[in-house]
Amino acid sequence: MKKLITTILYFTFLLGISIKAEVPSKLIRNENGSWQLIVNGKPFIMLAGELHNSSASTTEYLNSLWEPLKTLNLNTVLAPIAWEQFEPQEGTFDYTLIDSLINGARKNGLKLGILWFGSWKNGESSYAPTWVKEDTKRFFRVKNADGKDIETLSPFCENTMKADAKAFKVLVEYIKKVDRETGTVIALQPENEVGIFQDMDYSKASLKVYGQEVPQALIQYMKKNRKNLRSELLSVWEENGARTSGSWKDVFGDNAWSKSFYTTWQYATYIDYVAASAKEIYPLPVFCNCWLVQKAEDMPGVYPNGGPVSRVMDIWKAAAPHVDVLAPDIYLSDFKNIVADYHRADNPLLIPESVMKPANAFWVFGEHGALCYSPFGIEDGVGNFTFAQSYKVLDELMPFITKHQGSNRIIGVMKTADESERTVTMGDYQLRITYDAEDAYGMIIQNEKNEFIVAGINFKVHFASTNPKKIGYIKQVWEGGYTDGKWKATRLLNGDETYHNAVLIAKGRRTLTSEKVNDYNADHTDEIFVYSPSSYQAIWSPGIYRVTTYLR
């Protein structure tokens, strides 16, 4: 018995070590088969915002932002750490800014995604340390077609890759040391919008690789996934005979695409090396963002050539197994098609940069089971009451969103310019959604067989039966909200507000708010809460409705 107790205690001790060693966040497949972010043991969706590039460069400026940011109802902030500040001299590391970020976020109940501005940011190398920039022999540059150096660090330079990876590993090791128990930092992004603004790197090292065999890892990936390859990659490969060996020119032809594919492979393997160095010690989820192709006719180099644009996602998937998510930065109007491109079976949807448009957030969380929506320059949005209230509504619905994430029991609603209505089947009901304004958006969750939670603004929902022998009706419509997961009704809607229970009218939530005297300015944070005591304005934002239905 004594031996048994000793054995149990030993394995309990080992289990304790295992639990402590576990990272606070991870990606899993939920029961719906959808990717889900788990934070501190619970499903988590990032209602996020990304800071401007320089906002976290001093503690003073950063500290002025926390209180204003809280008014936007965020739960996560994406913030940069620059290599030039973290390792100002080689081998000397400054933890001031990462400490400030973690402590500030923790005090304000926020999670963090850390963006590593290392070798590249927006295709340039301006965030590399001075000691890297000045040593052009050790850390050589990309060469243009004329053989001249440009300021961008070459992805073919092993010295740069190892120096970058070392610094990032030290940063992540420190995050593990100070934050593992609390789990404030939940995701990492190595580099930012990588790629070069030309067709290829003409450095000696690059030209040597271009003449070598295409890595078998890519060939085998293409063979295995041939039926699902992006058309841009598949068509070039097949037009050149779908060869399974040979140089980049042999396999993909002597053209702009072969140059782009090999450039992409190099960037992806470089960043995978950086990511792997960190994951080895603290395997937080890793995502890589990209500057999108702006026009269909744009060739590589018009946009940063080498980044994970949709055309070359398959190359990234083959080359960078330590990168969990390829993430689009979306400022283009074709939002629905872009997110559909990036939401794949092997790639959950995560949007680290976009515009401050709440409709986008409702769409990606409702329609695509997204992990994150994050407007860029989030501090500029302080005072945007509609956006803040939209995030509040999403937060109220979070238990239901995470419960049904990725299933057919949740959909997004967002009107596009050419759309007049949408019809969708949910369980035994056929829902016809019509729009009352251009800015119509929200989500619909079938929480029970005959109960729907509808959140949104400026649209109507008609409930019909999928069985032609039956008719669908609305039983009741309650307007209200959720506090800590508990429903609190504000009104029972009927009569004019539902056309006598013929339709759900998502008019929105009306809030009377004091008129703001001053716009937010980071240098005058005390002014954000200065209001006129006698002036009020009505603000409309998404509302929440519980709809019970029946068939007869």
Located regions from the model:
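Catalytic-core region of carbohydrate-active enzymes that cleave or remodel glycosidic bonds
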Residues: 110, 273-284, 311-404
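Polysaccharide-binding and catalytic clefts of secreted carbohydrate-active enzymes
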Residues: 138-313
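N-terminal carbohydrate-binding accessory modules
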Residues: 21-74
